[in-house]
Amino acid sequence: MTQETKNSILIIGGGLVGLSIAYEFSRNNFKVLVLSKNRNESAGFVAAGMLATHAEGLEDELLKFGQESQNLIPKWIKSIEQDSNIKCGLKKCGIVVPFKNKEDLEEFPTYEYGKYLNHKDLQTEINGMNSIWKHGLLFEQDGQIDNRRR
């Protein structure tokens, strides 16, 4: 086995995870080849690049893991942007979770991390929201990455 072979890696799957792994190996002087069937089929492309630890209603250790991960993202994105000279479109825009009644809102696992929105506030945040949604939580710490950039 040659030194070049030892420092080569093949990654199957060009979604968020595959490309993230490829990036990290590349930064560590590995020769990387990514095989991807169809970028538009990847989960990250479909999920709209959401960074929604709180809006997803995660609990316990998974919530803690999500919060820690989300805190690392801005620094990681900055390194990607510096290395590639391409903006990733990180937006701390917040994510709204609507509720039909206040009881469901108060039982939401990450309720205490959100800003309460009454019906009027909810309509202001999401213009044209169906009137069946009476309450909402705005998770200002959540956001998204523009994952459809090329």
Predicted regions located by residue number:
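Helical element adjacent to the flavin cofactor pocket in flavoenzyme catalytic cores
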Residues: L137-R150
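Short, basic/glycine-rich phosphate-binding loops at helix/coil junctions
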Residues: G128-H135
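Beta1/beta-strand and adjacent pyrophosphate-binding region of the FAD-binding site
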Residues: T2-V17, L33
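Dinucleotide-binding Rossmann-like beta1-alpha1 core, especially the glycine-rich loop
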Residues: M50-I126
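Glycine-rich FAD pyrophosphate-binding loop
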Residues: S26-V46
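Short beta-strand/turn micro-motifs composed of small residues
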Residues: G13, S36, F99
